[in-house]
């Protein structure tokens, strides 16, 4: 039985189901899948006990290879001052790190000298205190600061006048005049008018003296008890007499309450510098600077190979190696070479005699046969190594001829 062919509507529904299946699966899984952005390594920095944080960041090597670099910096809320990380709200001048004046320059210590002092860089380089030295204004001005006499002081100077002169209000000019002129009570003494001092005429001084005397007399006429004091206040006046004598002084009273503190005085002159202290410990390494921008650097092709370098030095002679195995014995030796050498020497002697004497001299010694004459020699024999022939008892005289002269 043949099954009926599928209808067009069923085929369309099957194709639609196959195409929508993956989409429905993604929609179903979308509720369980979430996207989360991982924080960078720089956001996960950990602050150590020394308040120094280490941050990792990608960087390039000189060869162009990507690697990881590390940067050290102070933790958040801290700043780097004198080799260590301190809180940002900390006063860097609180511990007096400078010799004279200290300024907090955006978290860094800025040391300066007082007016009238100069900074000596060479002494600071050698760690020889003091670093701030007094300026001798009198010597550096060539006598132009004061009219008469210039006296140098720590951080400043003052002017003095010679005998018969008085100093003016500017503290530098001197005019001729008496130091203590006769004052009639209506003129002020010129030498008393100085910067930072009070002055008064003789008339004013006399008036103040009379006023003080009157106050003393009124105080002496005051009653000793409260009743008489009340009468005195209500209007009962007691006439003062110039002949009244004060009574004996009373007993000292108890200690009164302490008074309020006076105004702050002006700072005194700086004292002598103390001996130099021991050098402090070496500070910790500062944080690494920002990484350079290498995005504009392009990596080029590799260049050609350069010429070979100079040869290195010869090494030392090595140790002698172990001796090798002993070889097999060689062929038997022969005296042919020795006889040839003796014949060559004899020939040289003969040529030397011909050159010296003009003719060949005959020796009474036995002549040696040449190798090519061995077969025709009457006593030709095999002169080998001596292993195949018995030893001869008779010997030949193989010495060279000794009679060179005729």
UniProtKB/Swiss-Prot annotation:
Disulfide bonds join 138-150, 146-159, 161-174. Residues 270-279 have a biased composition (Pro residues). Residues 134-175 form the EGF-like domain. Residues 245-290, 300-333 form the Collagen-like domain. Its main location: secreted. One of its GO terms (molecular function) is protease binding. Residues 244-335, 360-406 are annotated as: Disordered. It holds the Pfam family Collagen. It is found in: Secreted. Detected in fibroblasts and urine (at protein level). Not expressed in blood or lymphatic endothelial cells. Glycans are attached at residues 142, 182, 385. Residues 386-406 have a biased composition (Basic and acidic residues). Residues 281-292 have a biased composition (Low complexity). Residues 1-34 form the signal peptide. The keyword Signal applies. Required for lymphangioblast budding and angiogenic sprouting from venous endothelium during embryogenesis. Belongs to the CCBE1 family. It is linked to Hennekam lymphangiectasia-lymphedema syndrome 1: A form of Hennekam lymphangiectasia-lymphedema syndrome, a generalized lymph-vessels dysplasia characterized by intestinal lymphangiectasia with severe lymphedema of the limbs, genitalia and face. In addition, affected individuals have unusual facies and some manifest intellectual disability. HKLLS1 inheritance is autosomal recessive. This is Collagen and calcium-binding EGF domain-containing protein 1. It comes from Homo sapiens (Human).
């Amino acid at each position: 039985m043949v099954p009926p062919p599928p209808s067009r509507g069923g085929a369309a529904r099957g194709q639609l189901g196959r195409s929508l299946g993956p989409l429905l699966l993604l929609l179903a899984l979308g509720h369980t899948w979430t996207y989360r952005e991982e924080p960078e390594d720089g956001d996960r920095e950990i602050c150590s006990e020394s308040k120094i944080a280490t941050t990792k960041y990608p960087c390039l090597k000189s060869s162009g290879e990507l690697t990881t670099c590390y940067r050290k910096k102070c933790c958040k809320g801290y700043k780097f001052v004198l080799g260590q990380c301190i809180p940002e709200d900390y006063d860097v001048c609180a511990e007096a790190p400078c010799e004279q004046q200290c300024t907090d320059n955006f978290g860094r210590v800025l040391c300066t000298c007082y007016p009238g002092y100069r900074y000596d860089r060479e002494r600071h380089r050698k760690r020889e205190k003091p670093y701030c030295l007094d300026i001798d204004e009198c010597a550096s001005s060539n006598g132009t600061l004061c009219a008469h006499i210039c006296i140098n002081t720590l951080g400043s100077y003052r002017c003095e006048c010679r005998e018969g002169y008085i100093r003016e209000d500017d503290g530098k000019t001197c005019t001729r005049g008496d130091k203590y002129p006769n004052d009639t009570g209506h003129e002020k003494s010129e030498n008393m008018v100085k910067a930072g001092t009070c002055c008064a005429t003789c008339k004013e001084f006399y008036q103040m003296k009379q006023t003080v005397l009157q106050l003393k007399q009124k105080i002496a006429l005051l009653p000793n008890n409260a009743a008489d004091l009340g009468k005195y206040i209500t209007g009962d006046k007691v006439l003062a007499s110039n002949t009244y004598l004060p009574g004996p002084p009373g007993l000292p009273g108890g200690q009164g309450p302490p008074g309020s503190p006076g105004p702050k005085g002006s700072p005194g002159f700086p004292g002598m510098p103390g001996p130099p202290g021991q050098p402090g410990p070496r500070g910790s390494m500062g944080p690494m600077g920002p990484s350079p921008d290498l995005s504009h650097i392009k990596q080029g092709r590799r260049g050609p190979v350069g010429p070979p370098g100079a040869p290195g030095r010869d090494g030392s002679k090595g140790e002698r190696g172990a001796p090798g195995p002993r070889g097999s014995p060689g062929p038997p030796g022969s005296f042919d070479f020795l006889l040839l050498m003796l014949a060559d020497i004899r020939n040289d002697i003969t040529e030397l005699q011909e050159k010296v004497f003009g003719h060949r001299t005959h020796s009474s010694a036995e002549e040696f046969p040449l190798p090519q004459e061995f077969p025709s020699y009457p006593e030709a024999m095999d002169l080998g190594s001596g292993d195949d022939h018995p030893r001869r008892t008779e010997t030949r005289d193989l010495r060279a001829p000794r009679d060179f002269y005729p």
